[in-house]
Swiss-Prot record:
It comes from the Eukaryota. GO terms for biological process: regulation of autophagy. This is CDGSH iron-sulfur domain-containing protein 2 homolog. It comes from Drosophila grimshawi (Hawaiian fruit fly). The chain crosses the membrane at residues 36-58. The gene is Cisd2. Residues 59-132 are cytoplasmic. [2Fe-2S] cluster binds at C97, C99, C108, H112.
Length: 132
């Protein structure tokens, strides 16, 4: 407990009192390069605390359940989208969509390509083929 007490009662107040914080607005323009470097650590700590508080308490920073959806337009009236495709009906091979962006559900039409370019993602189709 003694190191924490020393930090709070002695080290931290000494550090804060030694910071080159000017008394007036014009004083900020008279700070040297070394003074600006000394102000970086406390500024970074305050920015980190502010950002953490923003993420914790601001509703706009939290993800909503609606934006977490992967299916935005395919058969939304159904509770669960399920397609049964008989393997015997596949001629040589078939590409099935995994990204929910296709207009030709359940088959892939390459809509994931634009999504991959925009987001840097690597999603692709599931390709099912017959053994030869």
């Amino acid at each position: 407990m003694e190191p924490i007490s020393h930090l709070v009662k002695s080290s931290l107040p000494n550090y804060l009192s030694s910071l080159p914080v000017p008394d007036s607005l014009g004083g900020w323009f008279k700070l040297s390069f070394k003074d600006w470097l000394a102000l970086i650590p406390p500024t970074a700590v305050l920015a980190g605390l502010g950002y953490t508080a923003y993420l914790a308490f601001c509703p706009a920073a939290q993800c909503s359940a609606k934006s977490a959806r992967c299916n935005n337009h395919i058969r939304k009236h159904e509770a669960k989208v399920v397609d049964m495709i008989d393997v015997e009906d596949i001629a040589e091979k078939a590409a099935f969509c995994r990204c929910w962006k296709t207009k030709n559900w359940p088959y892939c039409d390459g809509s994931h390509g634009e999504h991959n370019k925009l987001t840097g993602d690597n999603v692709g189709p599931v390709v099912v083929s017959k053994k030869k």
